[in-house]
From Swiss-Prot:
Family, similarity comment: Belongs to the influenza viruses polymerase PB1 family.
Oligomeric and partner information: Influenza RNA polymerase is composed of three subunits: PB1, PB2 and PA. Interacts (via N-terminus) with PA (via C-terminus). Interacts (via C-terminus) with PB2 (via N-terminus); this interaction is essential for transcription initiation.
Record's function text: RNA-dependent RNA polymerase which is responsible for replication and transcription of virus RNA segments. The transcription of viral mRNAs occurs by a unique mechanism called cap-snatching. 5' methylated caps of cellular mRNAs are cleaved after 10-13 nucleotides by PA. In turn, these short capped RNAs are used as primers by PB1 for transcription of viral mRNAs. During virus replication, PB1 initiates RNA synthesis and copy vRNA into complementary RNA (cRNA) which in turn serves as a template for the production of more vRNAs.
Keyword Transferase: yes
Gene Ontology CC annotations of this record: host cell cytoplasm; host cell nucleus
Protein name: RNA-directed RNA polymerase catalytic subunit
Biological process annotations from GO: DNA-templated transcription; symbiont-mediated suppression of host gene expression; symbiont-mediated suppression of host mRNA transcription via inhibition of RNA polymerase II activity; viral RNA genome replication; viral transcription
Compartments in which it is found: Host nucleus; Host cytoplasm
Keyword field contains Secreted: no
Amino acid sequence: MDVNPTLLFLKVPAQNAISTTFPYTGDPPYSHGTGTGYTMDTVSRTHQYSEKGKWTTNTETGAPQLNPIDGPLPEDNEPSGYAQTDCVLEAMAFLEESHPGIFENSCLETMEVVQQTRVDKLTQGRQTYDWTLNRNQPAATALANTIEVFRSNGLTANESGRLIDFLKDVMESMDKEEMEITTHFQRKRRVRDNMTKKMVTQRTIGKKKQRLNKRSYLIRALTLNTMTKDAERGKLKRRAIATPGMQIRGFVYFVETLARSICEKLEQSGLPVGGNEKKAKLANVVRKMMTNSQDTELSFTITGDNTKWNENQNPRMFLAMITYITRNQPEWFRNVLSIAPIMFSNKMARLGKGYMFESKSMKLRTQIPAEMLANIDLKYFNESTRKKIEKIRPLLIDGTASLSPGMMMGMFNMLSTVLGVSILNLGQKRYTKTTYWWDGLQSSDDFALIVNALNHEGIQAGVDRFYRTCKLVGINMSKKKSYINRTGTFEFTSFFYRYGFVANFSMELPSFGVSGINESADMSIGVTVIKNNMINNDLGPATAQMALQLFIKDYRYTYRCHRGDTQIQTRRSFELKKLWEQTRSKAGLLVSDGGPNLYNIRNLHIPEVCLKWELMDEDYQGRLCNPLNPFVSHKEIESVNNAVVMPAHGPARSMEYDAVATTHSWTPKRNRSILNTSQRGILEDEQMYQKCCNLFEKFFPSSSYRRPVGISSMVEAMVSRARIDARIDFESGRVKKEEFAEIMKICSTIEELRRQK
């Protein structure tokens, strides 16, 4: 039927029409090849913003370093990193004055965290720069490798399991004259295959010991590896992001804990909360400004954008902030927190894989690793690359570039938010001492500024003053990219405000559909996404019902599980028809087994298995929930799982969904091609690590799991736990005498083996 599109909007308030402007239908762009060029761009831009600073040389590593702090005063219109220490300190002092006790309380909270955090905190997170192998690894492996190397070099404080003790080892490692590490390498030899009689290349993985002198070790400890940020929409150019090594991570974690604690107490901070909580917090600030702007006052809002936030921030400023925030605290605490910014002032950016060269005439491809860029002849490069390399050559050491100014992306989000809020805080009338005043919202580098004044001239004066105050602490508001509107319409962190935050439902569109994990998880995630959007994003009942029907259709096409009585022919239809005919209660069949859909918008919160359980044939129940089914390799399934949901804009979010373990919750097997590469040794380490952790969890189920106190190894803990459990089971009659004796014997054998080792 033909619909006149204007009819759709007859009863819709204008702000709800935002969902029709959705630009992001296709896949987001991904990067290929090396990120070396993007990293060099970052390095040269960062130095350019601070070029009038003072040059010094790091005495330990020999790296040239540029310090723009307290240098020339910043200029209007030109982005720069010339922050002034006294201005930052004064902003901090005023922030404390308007929030009495805020720093003191946050320090106390953080001190508690510092003393309790275990080193396994560092296993969270994805790819991490592993300094022992000089490339990225999963966080858990990188940590295991670091600890292993520390212990073989006589650094053992980490054995207590506390993060703070691991950090003591990090500090000591930097004073050592040399560190011995184990690296993986590959040997290739040509051998004749017995079966096919062809020559094949056989790869063997070796481990070899290598000594790093103090300078090389320090360079690695201070290195941030760089990658290209993927899936960024709305940008023509890609950009580099950084991943720090294990030496830096722990220190950063504590600084961010302190900053998070401060942000939680600041009404202008958009971090660390999210979602509806964030919207409520922000709406409060707007309400305050609107109600306080009397009838005579004008109120305007700037949807703000800062030029190159990270590249103009400076770790030395963060050091000044921390020194001020912790000024009345114990010496050890101040030292722990000041190490992260000091390490960042001496950081090195790893340039990545290097450049790929192709010779069209000779059909040759070769890679120039980053290490060679310092002394290769530049005639092979095109104009723009040549300029880039020439510019950063003086900064190169061992394939890394010295990068003292600037913060790499995403490192100190919370602390930089505190800096931004401290400037917003200065907008109160008691500080501006004139008729205009301002307030606003800050979330990492994103901000919204609300200015009130008696007339347009006052608004202009207020904006100018805010702009210049920001300049003094290294924040550069972009005049080109920020725009001003009457208060009541603005955008902040992809939330659109028009007399209240507008639900932009279309942003969630990419997360509708079938995830492709397995039949069980996909059904659960699909209905949860619809449910969540009804709660949070104004997804109305009729639209939700339609979304649900489309989802079921999509799901049936994906898994080829059309209803048993359908005419559609697929690879599975023969089996599903047979099942349909054998089943007495057809309503009990899961959708993935050709059953009908029983979901509607009222019961989206119930997992499908539970929804249909009473309707199922008994033998079907038995097959469906059978942990011994040999065709299903089971993960042990928690009652709640996490799925990663991709909205169109902003970071991927984790979403909880209910997981009921059935024979549909299969896990695909790992691709085997990795087993023939140099990654293999690492993969084996990782599996070993995984097995140990799983075993440990079997002994200490989460309900009874108290973090181990005192120093005992995992093995000792498990043995003593096994003995206690066995005794309890024996005394209550759950375990026979012979079994009990056997358990005790095994425990003794394990201890004996440990002693011999």
